[in-house]
């Protein structure tokens, strides 16, 4: 007997098999008829037999259905079936195929009665069985995730999110839901989306003061951490910068963590390394369901061929294994600048000359992680003025703060974190020096240092960047269902 998920519908229970549930029961011995629903990935008619590959989005693997052809009516019926159509299939029988790539297949002996066409497609349905570039697929936001390559990245995203939840729960973190609407700019960069209503003449009339979409939930997390000790969130964040690059979005998701009783940057980096390695280990253990079975060339203007599946799969597996097995390095920002200057002056010039006191550029980050260390690297202790106001100042004379960025090969920075300044007077002086809090808009934040404060710190992980890196696709537009950038209008 096949086991299926059971749902309540209209007061009655009914069972529904999925493609994934069939793969999970490959060793069954039941001869019961099988019913399943899905979309046609491909169909091929030969002289006496037809092969139909069905997908339903639950598995990276399609379901092979074999249809013996016994008369012309069956042939004519199958000729109307096309890629992308929705089918409801009944009375299929299980056939074990242990010596083939797919360990089983379904067989239908009366396709006219057993196959019901539920949803047709138009004559110009764009997702035919042919090579398509990622650039082209991005122009099809309502259909692109029906492809094997892009649906797999969403399943990976779902899996990784679930693994984070399990890990944090096991380690006594509380998941919280901080607000999206805020009156503050956490990063101090001024690149904010201001919120107004369609009936209010000014942006401040609804809430009584200017209100924005959050760029980070960190300030609110600090409030909650001082009650819960350990908390985390996965929330949408918004930045109104004009960057249209493979690494930037106007709307993205940030996994943010805040912990009390943290006294050193090393405590934060050790926790980050342990956490990420735990997530990667779970991915490796489930690689058969996570690794895509189709790849699309990163050369988006070249639509001539698909890349070798085995080669691409091995590259992803190697990346995952290296994240676990390779040494993660730890250097200061000052050390990083020295390394970059030597490369810039002695080997080849960067586009942006590395200078102490200036933020690291993407090319610098990629060189450090991808060429110099060839592994993840934590860069710590940045100059104070390179970073936001809330970071804890180091006791050293070099005017740096206790912070870190995690750089990974091929992508650059994916995580940033810091100790938070818990000294009331130092925090006030820093904000005054930056011209902040002149109207008392951050008094609530500063006052936390007077009401049972504790040493604390945390970090934020750009979720799309992390998923893109794991998947081997370094354009984060493909790691979020509906990407938003300044370069493209929002049509829905």
Swiss-Prot record:
Its main location: mitochondrion. Catalyzes the attachment of asparagine to tRNA(Asn) in the mitochondrion. The lineage of its organism: Eukaryota, Fungi, Dikarya, Ascomycota, Saccharomycotina. Present with 784 molecules/cell in log phase SD medium. This is Asparagine--tRNA ligase, mitochondrial. Its EC number is 6.1.1.22. GO terms for biological process: asparaginyl-tRNA aminoacylation; mitochondrial asparaginyl-tRNA aminoacylation. One of its GO terms (molecular function) is ATP binding. It is found in: Mitochondrion matrix. InterPro entries: Aa-tRNA-synt_II, aa-tRNA-synth_II, aa-tRNA-synth_II/BPL/LPL, Asn-tRNA-ligase, Asp/Asn-tRNA-synth_IIb, NA-bd_OB-fold, NA-bd_OB_tRNA. The gene is SLM5. Belongs to the class-II aminoacyl-tRNA synthetase family. One of its GO terms (cellular component) is mitochondrial matrix. SUPFAM superfamilies: Class II aaRS and biotin synthetases, Nucleic acid-binding proteins. It catalyses: tRNA(Asn) + L-asparagine + ATP = L-asparaginyl-tRNA(Asn) + AMP + diphosphate + H(+). The keyword rRNA-binding does not apply. It comes from the Eukaryota. Keywords: Aminoacyl-tRNA synthetase, ATP-binding, Ligase, Mitochondrion, Nucleotide-binding, Protein biosynthesis, Transit peptide.
